[in-house]
Amino acid sequence: MTEAVIVDAIRTAAGRKKGMLIQTHPVDILAPILKELVNRSGVDANEVDDVVTGCVTMTSEQGGNIGRMAVLAAGFPVEVPAYSLNRMCGSSQQAIHNAAQTILAGDADITIACGVENMSRVSMGSDMGSFSSELVDRFNIVPQGFSAEMIAEKWALSREELDELSLESHRRAAESADNGDFEREILPINVKKENGEETFYQDEGIRRTTSMDKLASLTPSFQPDGGVVTAGNSSQVSDGAAGLLLMSREKAMQLGVKPRARIIARAVVGEDPVLMLTGVIPATRKVLKKAGLNLEQIDAIEINEAFASVVKAWERELNPDMSKVNARGGAIALGHPLGASGAKLTTTLLHRLEDKNGKYGLQVMCIGFGMATATIIERL
């Protein structure tokens, strides 16, 4: 039976809002990832059957099928096709699923799954207009931050709990950066600056000097009177790209390329679009069932820290060993470049599994309007 295996996984560092990547076109953030995936694996780009790209705000510089634009900018043969997809925050995780499914179906031997978002240049929501009247008649659609507040209220989560999770995210991220834990997964890229070019290789969002006092001083972003969700316990506006090279196990053996992991289960769920962000709970249960595993068997977990309340509600329901969860920090510290985040987290998950000699890794991500994606990989 055909298996979809991960041969390589890399990402750029995550740029902060209007930071190092502000002058870099999103295509030029993704193209180096594509080049490096084929160059360092020794794969001939001609053999890539398809490139699947996740991107959320597909307008302006990110419109026009950005995946195809990046393939051409990377110098791939024109015969290499690409398409772009939007499952909101789960976009590049869905790209991984689609790329794997194409291999499992026998339609491809080699695929690339990737994602990109330059939120500094293409603002979140700039691709949206008004909601349909039939939609709003059925559902009281609210901004995600209000959903995060609803989650905090439903699970009786205190401001202190959310800020503690945020502080720990920054602490873990800083420690991991200092220990060189991200060096294998981050591809340094040259970026345009006013005085020429600079090499960008470090995540910009880590706040080493934050504290509970500093976090407590922030005004709630969505409910100023009594709310608990702040900029400090929410993910950051970020820029970046990430990508994975996938093959059938047979093709990897034929090319003499060592597979690093195999994708053993994939899941996507729908959930209440008003509460919106709680799909991570049923998605985790669904993907574990598909894999025939329980949470105790998972060695490393990446859950997107869109909001601290999402992670805390998930923790309350599933009771995971939190030392395994976002062990190198999460999106509160490391950023959430929307369409790139799924591939970014899978990249971190794979490297974490390798570094700790773990076997199974779980990735799960909440998605706007009430969805979630989940993936389980097995290190080989």
Task: Give the residues covered by each predicted segment.
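N-terminal extracellular/periplasmic Venus flytrap/periplasmic-binding protein-like
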Residues: 10-12, 22-23, 29-32, 40, ...
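Conserved beta-ketoacyl condensing-enzyme motif
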Residues: 22-111, 116-132, 186-201, 274, ...
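Short, well-ordered amphipathic alpha-helical segments that serve as non-catalytic structural scaffolds
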Residues: 26-41, 66-70, 95, 144-151, ...
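Conserved catalytic cysteine-centered active-site region
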Residues: 55-108, 139-146, 209-236, 317-344, ...
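Active-site-proximal alpha-helical scaffold in enzymes
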Residues: 87-116, 152-182, 243-250, 337-358, ...
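Active-site pocket-lining segment
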Residues: 185, 193, 264-333
